[in-house]
C-alpha cells in the first residue's frame, strides 16, 4: 500500500489502496507533478492550452 491518495477514474472514489475497492480498477495519483524551473513539458502544455482556447472560440 502506498501512502498517497488515489482516485478511481471510473467510480470517482478516493482511496489509499492499490486498487479501487468498488470495481477493482486501476487508480490514478491525484497529486500534481513537482514544480521545476526547467519546465520540460511547458511547451506542450501551452500548445494544448492554445488549441483548447481556439476550440472554445469556434
UniProtKB/Swiss-Prot annotation:
Gene3D superfamilies registered for this protein in UniProt: H/ACA ribonucleoprotein complex, subunit Nop10
GO CC aspect terms: ribonucleoprotein complex
The keyword Transmembrane helix is assigned to this record: no
Function: Involved in ribosome biogenesis; more specifically in 18S rRNA pseudouridylation and in cleavage of pre-rRNA.
Gene for this chain: nop10
GO MF: snoRNA binding
InterPro entries: H/ACA_rnp_Nop10 (IPR007264), H/ACA_rnp_Nop10_sf (IPR036756), Nop10_arc-typ (IPR023532)
NCBIfam families according to UniProt: PRK13130.1
Top-level division of the source organism's lineage: Archaea
Organism in which the protein naturally occurs: Methanobrevibacter smithii (strain ATCC 35061 / DSM 861 / OCM 144 / PS)
Biological processes annotated in GO: pseudouridine synthesis; rRNA processing
Regions that span the bilayer: none
Family the UniProt entry places it in: Belongs to the NOP10 family.
Keyword line: Ribonucleoprotein, Ribosome biogenesis, rRNA processing
UniProt-recorded name of the protein: Ribosome biogenesis protein Nop10
